[in-house]
């Protein structure tokens, strides 16, 4: 008998295990919750582990805000060796004798590393060209031209240097490819490198939140599974809040522009007494509040 899917709304902070694709991990979460709709907010390679926010139900409407969020990673890179994929997916194709590197020299290189630079995405990535992910071209031995993308590095912190393995944490903007960062950093140190370990520690704004493993979720009762979910609006903590007066609620929920006493322009989270979170709106000149993204009445009651 096929289990009936149901409406489940919220965000699960999954600790994706090694060896499992992001899509595969989401499928397991979707099955555990018997959810009609689920999606992740920024894939992790099978050889990476860690924070993977999974949006269920109406939370999927706001997943793009997590795609745009800053992320923090714990990185292990092996210096003096290069692979075609820049990680452990492919064999070593080049080795170099390591230059004399001290922890102090590496600290200096981390401090001097550009905080904003144009990074060329790797061929071994999920970015698509002509409808196919780049890694499919790479596995067929085809190299495609890739446009450099501006990324931001907010923090680089050395954890340990025990040659040839370099351990560091990085907090960066969306779109940053850590395997390319490791290669670029190695080049500044006069050598080559590839990733041997990668763990995503957090995704803003959830950096301090605990993560759930699949094994822990599988052991939970139905009520405990529900309690593990963050509310739909958790992804929007950084947005300004606006409480809508009762007189404008129905029109707003029907997608109509309503008046507001708040005339500061910008995107806001909208709430109503007794209903909670309604969605996102934009305050425009003359105190006009325009609906941008609304959740269903069912999700309000969930």
Descriptions of predicted regions:
Residues 1-44, 48, 104, 188-302:
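Accessory RNA 3′-end/elbow-binding domains used by RNA modification enzymes
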């Amino acid at each position: 008998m096929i289990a009936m899917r149901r409406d489940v709304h919220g965000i699960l902070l999954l600790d994706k295990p090694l060896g499992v694709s992001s899509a595969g991990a989401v499928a397991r979460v979707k099955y555990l919750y018997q959810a009609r709709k689920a999606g992740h907010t920024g894939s992790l390679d099978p050889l990476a582990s860690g924070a993977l926010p999974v949006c269920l139900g109406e939370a999927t409407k706001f997943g793009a805000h997590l795609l745009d969020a800053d992320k923090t990673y714990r990185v292990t890179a092996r210096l003096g060796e290069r692979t075609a994929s820049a990680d452990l997916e492919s064999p070593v194709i080049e080795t170099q004798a390591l230059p004399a590197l001290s922890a102090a020299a590496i600290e200096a290189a981390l401090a001097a590393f550009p905080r904003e630079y144009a990074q060329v995405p790797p061929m071994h990535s999920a970015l698509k060209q002509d409808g196919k992910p780049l890694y499919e071209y790479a596995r067929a031995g085809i190299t495609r031209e890739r446009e450099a993308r501006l990324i931001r590095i907010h923090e680089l912190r050395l954890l340990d240097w025990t040659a040839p393995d370099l351990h560091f944490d990085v907090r960066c903007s969306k779109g940053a490819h850590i395997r390319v960062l490791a290669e670029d950093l190695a080049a500044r140190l006069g050598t080559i490198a590839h990733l041997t370990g990668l763990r995503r520690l957090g995704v803003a704004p959830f950096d301090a939140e605990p993560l759930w493993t699949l094994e822990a979720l599988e052991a939970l009762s139905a009520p405990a599974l529900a309690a593990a979910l963050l509310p739909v609006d958790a992804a929007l903590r950084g947005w300004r809040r606006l409480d809508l007066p009762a007189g404008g609620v129905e029109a707003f929920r029907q997608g109509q522009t309503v008046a507001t006493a708040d005339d500061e322009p910008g995107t806001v989270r909208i709430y109503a007494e007794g209903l909670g979170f309604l969605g996102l709106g934009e305050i425009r000149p003359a105190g006009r509040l325009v609906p941008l993204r609304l959740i269903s009445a069912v999700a309000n009651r969930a």
